[in-house]
């Protein structure tokens, strides 16, 4: 029994190495022959094993738990396939590295929609199969060739109610007005959301943001540089706020919900002019589960999954059919709720996919 299991595992690993180009055909044939198994049977067995489950590449923590309960259970009930996780974080460079190596181990990456714009045309992603996935179950412009928005998260801001009393900041112009609203601000150091906020503070309408006027945005950001701190993770900005290091902070709206609770309402979330960011699913080229991943993506679009992700993670549904079913207690925090949807601004993934690298570099130089 031990010998059979060893041969099975050895052949499965050899099949993966052969398909990834790390083993030549002659060596692979020799191993199969020595084991008394036909090459095609080994490859078929490897594919069958991969098709038993889908591997989601995300950021771990609560995200793993919530995606498992909100989507994984329904996906398994519908298809009989399981859901596993790689929680190492699908950074764009890591996706490129995985695909270029030929050793693709993930089926779907929890990413931003602009990653579909930058990675798809370079051959690093599979196209979305819209005969399975629905373009109608996301917002217009957010169903792209190589990625589809599943949820939305918003760049909003929180402020200290004790600092501003009965005259609180209400929009981005107030956030950038350090004379009327003195105090230290916290901005996202990777530029996204901060650039758009600066332009709206400088008088640009939300509908006229793109293409971003980088000089104008950076000048506005530099105007409050002496009153600003910069954060790179949700836990970092959360700590800044709850420890009263800042009076206001640009923040993801789901983190804002947590901060309101953790500070007993001392800090309040403002979703007016929140920048709606399309969180997306993208599929690395050559994903091991093949077409089965499209059923997983379609399951994530269904209303129960959308509402479950909102309840568990605070991520807002991108399926318009779910907007009217957002529970009353989630209305203040969900950016596509009836309370907020007319006040938000939409991110342009095409602009960020083509210009994001240069924009981030210019932003980092401006705040250094």
Please identify what each model-predicted range represents.
Residues 50-117:
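Early extracytoplasmic/lumenal segment of secretory-pathway proteins
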Residues 1-23, 27, 34:
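N-terminal secretory signal peptides
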Residues 20-27, 36-50:
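N-terminal twin-arginine translocation
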Residues 61-68, 104-242:
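Extracytoplasmic ligand-binding site segments that recognize negatively charged/polar headgroups
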Residues 307-368:
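C-terminal capping/gating helix-and-loop segments adjacent to ligand/active sites or protein-protein/ligand interfaces
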Residues 66-67, 153, 180-193, 215-223, 262-287, 300-323:
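Periplasmic-binding protein-like
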Residues 156-163, 199-204, 277-292, 297-299, ...:
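A bilobed periplasmic-binding-protein/Venus flytrap-type ligand-binding module shared by bacterial periplasmic
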